[in-house]
Amino acid sequence: EYDTAFFDKRSKFVHYRPLVAILNNLEFDHADIFPDVAAIQRQFHHLVRTVPRRGRLLVNGHDERLREVLAMGCWTPVERFGFDASFEWCARKLRDDGSAFAVVHCGREVGIVEWPLLGDHNVLNGLAALAACAAVGVDVAGILAALARFRSVKRRMEVVGTHAGITVYDDFAHHPTAIATTLAGLRAKVGDARIVVAMEPRSNSMRLGAHADALAPSLDVADAVVFLARPELPWDADKVIAAIRGDAQAVADADALVARLRALARAGDHVVVMSNG
């Protein structure tokens, strides 16, 4: 979370004073203001300390850095969520793409979610939201019904159109982990169909090169990648291009990117435009 103001360098969320907080994952980001992961963990520790004893912390049980945050001091009841049956809240995927999963609470199945969202990250998001609502007394059956009606938000694998058998998605890709899990969910849904990615490193952290080494692996499931490497990038985009498994090409501007996509795309393809610009 970004800092509050030029005179208050604490992350904005320390002012929220939540009764229930979801800690979904913790990775290095916002390289323009944080020097390292430890600095981000300190801010999360401050957030944890603001949640009262009568509140609840819902924590991704798979995340080692969040476990380290809790070890810094936590006096609020904690419930873990994830894919592990030992967690208080567990998701058991019924479809590989994440569009259907069973919800298990303390070893007992409480319902099934079927929705249009894809990817493990969305399964965890939905599970955490359900756990948070249950923590404040919302009926689980009502939560399940609400999740089934949820149609996601803008720019999160949003289908913007289909033309000549080509489906185009808009995705707010801000971090390699999010890119990887988003594409993995799409791959599970479309099977062997071609996935073509138009990638722009647009966030401050991306442009500074903080995630450069992780970018190529995050694109592993793509069959083709068109990488928008603007001349002002301060890091070597060619090194990333060379490490991408699929057919990859760098272009210098948006017009060249569109021209390359037109040449690449064919009926049956899934074209994902990934940029947070």
Please state what every model-predicted region is.
Residues R56, E64, C90-R92, L118, ...:
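N-terminal leader/targeting and accessory segments in enzymes
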Residues G61-R65, F83-D84, E232-L233:
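Short, polar loop motifs at secondary-structure junctions
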